[in-house]
């Protein structure tokens, strides 16, 4: 597991926000199942025990006063010509929202991506998740495509 501090700056209240990059190496894995577990595992130093979709997961997280208050967990698809970073999970602690923390977190996330050769960021977002859509748009992401669904009723099969 690679863990590296990547910067710090004040949020809108003046609190110092520290950003850290984490990368799974070899058999290590990253992806929290629950947000509180994610925070506890980092704080307890057990990042190597996380589970994930693949062994290429990475994370950028932010802390205030040594408390994790936000994160982005992401990976890259191996068949992607455009070196897209896919956001798997993102979160800011509800007690720290409305302070510009997601923008700070995303800024350091983009810094890491540029340094590692990524050229694009993508995220699946439900059309019903207005807060997530707004946070994506606040950092310059745009709606790109539509997912089509049809829910099948049991009698549709007969």
Regions found by a protein language model. Name each.
Residues 16-20, 37, 104, 108, ...:
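Alpha-helical elements of Rossmann-like donor-binding domains used by nucleotide-donor carbohydrate transfer enzymes
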Residues 1-28, 32, 156-158:
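Conserved N-terminal entry element of GNAT/NAT acetyltransferase domains
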Residues 113-125:
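Conserved GNAT acetyl-CoA-binding A-motif
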Residues 92, 98-111, 134, 138:
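Conserved acetyl-CoA-binding loop-helix of GNAT-fold acetyltransferases
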Residues 24-82:
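Acetyl-CoA-dependent GNAT
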Residues 103, 126-146:
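Conserved active-site alpha-helix within GNAT-family acetyltransferase domains
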Residues 82-94, 146-149:
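Conserved acetyl-CoA binding element of GNAT-fold acetyltransferases
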Residues 148-156:
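Short beta-strand-to-coil "C-cap" segments at the C-terminal boundary of structured domains/repeats
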């Amino acid at each position: 597991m690679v863990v590296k501090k990547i910067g710090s700056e004040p949020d809108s209240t003046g609190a110092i926000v520290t950003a850290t990059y984490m990368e799974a190496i070899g058999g290590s894995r990253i992806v929290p199942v629950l947000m509180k577990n994610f925070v506890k595992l980092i704080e307890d130093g057990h990042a190597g025990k996380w589970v994930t979709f693949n062994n290429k997961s990475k994370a950028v997280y932010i802390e205030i006063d040594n408390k994790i208050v936000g994160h982005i967990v992401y990976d890259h698809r191996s068949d992607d010509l455009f070196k897209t970073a896919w956001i798997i999970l993102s979160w800011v602690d509800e007690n720290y929202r409305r302070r510009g923390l997601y923008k700070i977190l995303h800024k350091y996330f983009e810094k890491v991506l540029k340094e590692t050769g990524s050229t694009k960021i993508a995220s699946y977002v439900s059309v019903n998740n207005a807060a997530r859509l707004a946070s994506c748009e606040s950092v310059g992401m745009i709606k790109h495509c539509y997912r089509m669904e049809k829910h099948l009723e049991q009698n549709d099969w007969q």
